[in-house]
């Protein structure tokens, strides 16, 4: 009969095994979110530019990334980047580059939808004031679009945090890896995986509640 014993879980286990992985997962999530939004914004602007030389490459990149499983992209970057630059870069840096490149495709779609949600009248008003395309986007469109996109950005960030567990494929020490090592060392793999699931649930559920609160505030502002 299966028996579960969670008494082994203590502060020492957390500091020795879990904390390091948690910090890396959070760091990877934050960097990938910021980097993904920056790159994704450029991709979205390229797709909305109307210039074939910009639209086609950006569309190809976004569609390709969105059509390939993340774990495959993680493995590709980990194996191919060292070959291209002639030296190893390590699992942590490889994971960071991969997540920025991968998430940029998803954030670009969010940004594109956000820009398109801004009333055309706002754009025409900017043009009537003599603004260039760049000024119109920077001063009129993007500020309104980003306010509308904040809840969706946060939702995608929650998904991103969950996806960081896939870096186990290249040996990076993330939150799940910390629980896995603790389970092996303490001889309690089942219990540690249960605790890992509970930890992910608590973090993601808390963030989802924050998203709902922000959505309500954005709706009130509108």
Locate predicted features.
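Transmembrane alpha-helices and adjacent helix-loop boundaries
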Residues: 1-222
């Amino acid at each position: 009969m299966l028996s579960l014993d969670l008494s082994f879980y203590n502060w020492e286990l957390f500091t020795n095994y879990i904390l390091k992985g948690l910090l890396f997962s959070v760091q990877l999530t934050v960097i990938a979110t910021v980097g993904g939004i920056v790159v994704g914004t450029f991709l979205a602007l390229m797709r909305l530019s109307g210039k074939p030389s910009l639209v086609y490459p950006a569309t190809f990149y976004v569609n390709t990334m969105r059509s390939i499983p993340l774990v495959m992209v993680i493995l590709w970057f980990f194996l191919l980047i060292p070959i291209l630059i002639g030296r190893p870069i390590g699992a942590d840096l490889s994971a960071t580059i991969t997540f920025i490149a991968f998430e940029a495709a998803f954030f670009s779609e969010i940004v594109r939808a956000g820009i398109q949600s801004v009333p055309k009248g706002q754009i025409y008003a900017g043009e009537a004031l003599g603004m260039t395309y760049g000024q119109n986007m920077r001063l009129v469109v993007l500020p309104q679009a980003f306010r509308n996109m904040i809840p969706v950005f946060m939702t995608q960030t929650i998904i991103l945090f969950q996806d960081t567990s896939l870096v186990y494929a290249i040996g990076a020490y993330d939150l799940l890896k910390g629980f896995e090592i603790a389970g092996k060392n303490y001889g309690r793999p089942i219990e540690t995986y249960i605790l890992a699931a509970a930890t992910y649930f608590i973090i993601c559920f808390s963030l989802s509640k924050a998203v709902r609160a922000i959505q309500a505030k954005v709706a009130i502002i509108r």
